[in-house]
Every structure is written in C-alpha cells, then in structure tokens.
Amino acid sequence: MKANSRKMATTGVKPAVLFLGLLGLVCLCSSPSAAGFRSPESLVRNVYAYYGDRTSALSSGLPHDAETIRQFFDPSLWDAWRAPTKAPYDFLVQSASWKLSAVSISILRKQFDRTYVTATFDNKGKPVTMNFILVNGPDGWVIYDVESPHDSLRAYLTQYRN
C-alpha cells in the first residue's frame, strides 16, 4: 500500500482526480452524436421504427421535435419539418394512418456527396416505394430529401405549411 501511495504522490495525481477524469472520458466517448447515423441503411431503418401500431409515442410517426430534427434531417430541412402543417397525410408512409409490412431497404446508387436509398413496404396492403436522398454530414448520415412517385418531401412540406 505504501508503494502505491508513494507512486501516486510522485506523479502528483490523486486517485479521486484520476477516477473522475477517466469517468468523464468514458462518458464523452459513449455519448451518442447529436445528429446523423453511421450508415444510410440505419437512418432509413430508424425512420420507419417510429411507424408502429400507435400504442406508444415511439410508434406514432416521426416526431417534429428539435432533437429528432437534428438527428434525422439536413439543416436545410429543419425549419420546414418543425413548422406546423395542415398536411392531409404523413408523407413518409403516404397515408394518414398506417399498418406497415416489413420494410425493405436497399441502396440505389452513390453519387458524389449523396446516396440514394429505396424503402419499399406495404401500408395496409397498398405497395409504397420511397426514395431517400441522404447526405453524409459532419455527424453522420441525414435526410436531404425524400421522393415518392408523385412528390418530394421538400415540396410537400412547402405546400402544406401554415
């Protein structure tokens, strides 16, 4: 025990300070990033994880709160997603209500700074295909736009903005 005390005294570091420093380092390294995802597929998978049976807040569609906006969207979409809308349906599932089948996710192409990902699923028996345009930002992958066969998320949010 004396050898350890002597060694600590010579380095000038007290055990409590060393412990707190290591604890702080572990907390910093294990905290999730404020935005983005590690892969394009994980981003799209996490979008549709919010579309369950509506028995909880986690299954009532992708939220419009600040934390979700920063995590999922490119800064150019933040204001549009946050703004109240009179939208007649949820663009990401193409319906006002949903009962989704398994979601199939595949990368269509990688082009310069963007990756195009297709998500296909059935919503109440109706086939739906959504094309996500994703960009790799400083904190990970985020949504730049989403396209349905008839519209884009950017145009949709602009059209139904209050």
Name these PLM-found stretches.
Residues 109-114, 124-127, 145-162:
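Low-complexity, intrinsically disordered terminal/linker segments enriched in charged
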Residues 35, 71-126:
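Surface-exposed, charged secondary-structure patches
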Residues 55-65:
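Surface-exposed patches in mature extracellular/periplasmic domains of secreted proteins
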Residues 16-27:
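Bacterial N-terminal signal peptides
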